[in-house]
């Protein structure tokens, strides 16, 4: 953390927080936002700083209100300073799902998380939310092409265009666009869920919420880029989720698994692109270690559905696995 950044944080706290407190980093984030824990004698609070020109606060505040109004455990907003990019909020603790998940806790923790997804889908307002449409999918998959294929693997566009990669993505995008849509958190995974004593889980990083595929948040949870589970366990949890929402949507079990798989494929390609961008643009090298795990999810799905053959063949022709 550079000295100038620290001075900005300390200056804001001095001017806006009356009680004396200790300031320490609360978490690392895959964005321009930073989080700080303010420790008081008998309490802690979280201070989020998001440079206004890079990470406007309006979306975070908007989605926070939507989720809080239906009983989702999101931080309580205590003070905002939009002009300088600060939000002071309640502290949901330091027990990320990623740190406490194991074979003994996974069913309980994921059941709570699944109930939260169901509640968001059924009750959260989607008024004026952006739709996760083909244009948005295409933009995200462009991150994979630019930052992973071009920048990280040094594969130029001419080489990519000799394959049927683009044609394969068009098929994928159209398939995903036909999936029923609902409120989507969009980053519902083990680093953004906090284990809490009451109303578990605490839900963070919700500012990018959209109206999107009903399988988006569940695949973010069960095919997590940061932790892998046995396929039987994830399918059991998936069926538990589908049983809880089947009264709202019309689908067969096979169809739902397919929606889950292809939504995950799009998300995982995007995530690989973002991990590469974090390394090359933002000097956050630790995310590179998550690429092999994420690409393994991609490979499994490409083997399952014949209409994904063009993407599968392109990955083989570009020798992606050998270059990881």
For each of these PLM feature ranges, what is it?
Residues 5, 9, 13-15, 125-130, ...:
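An alpha-helical support segment within catalytic cores of ATP-dependent transferases
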Residues 25, 34-39, 47, 120, ...:
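Active-site acidic catalytic loop and adjacent metal/ATP-binding pocket
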Residues 109, 185, 210-211, 260-265:
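Secondary-structure capping and boundary motifs in well-ordered enzyme cores
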Residues 143-152, 214-250, 262-282, 294-301:
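Active-site activation/catalytic loop segments of kinase-like enzymes and analogous catalytic loops
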Residues 250-258:
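Histidine/acidic-rich helix-loop-helix segments that form or flank divalent-metal centers
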Residues 273-324:
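ATP/Mg2+ or Mg2+-diphosphate-binding catalytic cores
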């Amino acid at each position: 953390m550079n000295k100038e950044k620290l001075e900005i944080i300390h200056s804001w706290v001095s001017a806006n927080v009356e009680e004396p407190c200790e300031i320490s980093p609360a978490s690392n984030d895959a964005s321009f936002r930073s989080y700080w824990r303010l420790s008081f004698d008998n309490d802690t609070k979280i201070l989020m700083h998001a440079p206004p020109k890079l990470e406007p606060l309006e979306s975070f505040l908007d989605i926070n209100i939507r989720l809080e109004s239906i009983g989702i455990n999101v931080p309580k907003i205590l003070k905002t300073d939009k002009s300088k990019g600060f939000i002071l909020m309640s502290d949901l603790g330091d027990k990320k799902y990623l740190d406490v998940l194991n074979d003994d806790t996974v069913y309980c923790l994921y059941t709570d998380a699944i109930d939260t997804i169901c509640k968001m889908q059924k009750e959260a307002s989607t008024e004026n939310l952006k739709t996760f449409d083909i244009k948005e999918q295409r933009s995200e998959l462009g991150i994979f092409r630019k930052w992973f294929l071009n920048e990280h693997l040094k594969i130029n566009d001419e080489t990519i265009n000799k394959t049927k990669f683009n044609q394969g993505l068009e098929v994928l995008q159209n398939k995903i666009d036909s999936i029923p849509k609902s409120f989507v958190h969009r980053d519902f995974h083990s680093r953004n869920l906090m284990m809490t004593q009451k109303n578990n889980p605490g839900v963070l990083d919700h500012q990018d919420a959209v109206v999107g595929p009903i399988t988006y948040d569940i695949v973010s949870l069960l095919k997590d880029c940061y932790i892998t589970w046995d396929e039987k366990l994830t399918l059991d949890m998936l069926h538990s989720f589908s049983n809880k929402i089947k009264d709202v949507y019309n689908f067969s079990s096979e169809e739902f698994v397919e929606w889950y798989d292809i939504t995950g494929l799009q998300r995982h390609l995007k995530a690989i692109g973002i991990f590469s961008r974090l390394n090359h643009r933002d000097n956050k090298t630790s995310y590179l270690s998550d690429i092999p795990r994420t690409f393994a999810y991609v490979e499994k799905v490409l083997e399952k559905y014949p209409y994904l053959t063009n993407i599968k063949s392109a990955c083989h022709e570009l020798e992606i696995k050998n270059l990881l």
